């Protein structure tokens, strides 16, 4: 079976599937220039249209278009701009978390850029940003990402990715009353969501056979609700008297260290250490460093693994046995 085109999930599916029961059609146009001109080595342009539906029943969910223009300069700098525009309302059949319900989604536009310097430089900073706007409910989205990279020498390099995201007046599912005998009531909320992600990647190559890699990541999300609504059968929202505190803060910290040693052709030993912390609270802390300190004092899990892969050349073994 095919989950993309089915209302049911398949036990034989592999990979990551956000939603099943989807049916999408797309139309794409490309315009590419591969020969250098002016200050540019190459120039690529994309225009794509998407028409989305449920597979069963065949219901309209959304129409959108995406554009991107990217170029590489003669200095080997990379520049890209893009936009994603949803010009007409649609419906989300998954966010209500209950079969037979839908949420009406509204017009929205998102614009972004990216700049990457020449990666041959020992020090550089990747920069990207996005701004999204939706008139209904005053929805806004701001995104900024910085990625400094340092190559100290041929053995040691370091990369730090800092990602900021602020979603203002975002709509989403909060709760529902699933008690028997009561009419189903689904509550949505208008919220402000803040995300900060810090990721540090380092790599040290001792020899052509021995290497050490370290990845440290901290993810922090804060959600504060401003208003609550009751979802209607037609997908619209009506003001609700719901007044529970649904604000929360989530912290996820991960550390992954990998030591690898290729001790023979086709043979390798790998030692891995993983450290993980997960902390969720309804208490909001606005100071990043104070929040990080609390996270590091939370309970954590450590795991260690050792893997040895040995390549045995049976042809050579049998050849030696015959000769003896």
List the predicted regions and their residue ranges.
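Exposed, low-structure sequence patches enriched in small/polar residues
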Residues: 8-324
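Single conserved hydrophobic/aromatic residue that forms the stacking wall/gate
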Residues: 1-9
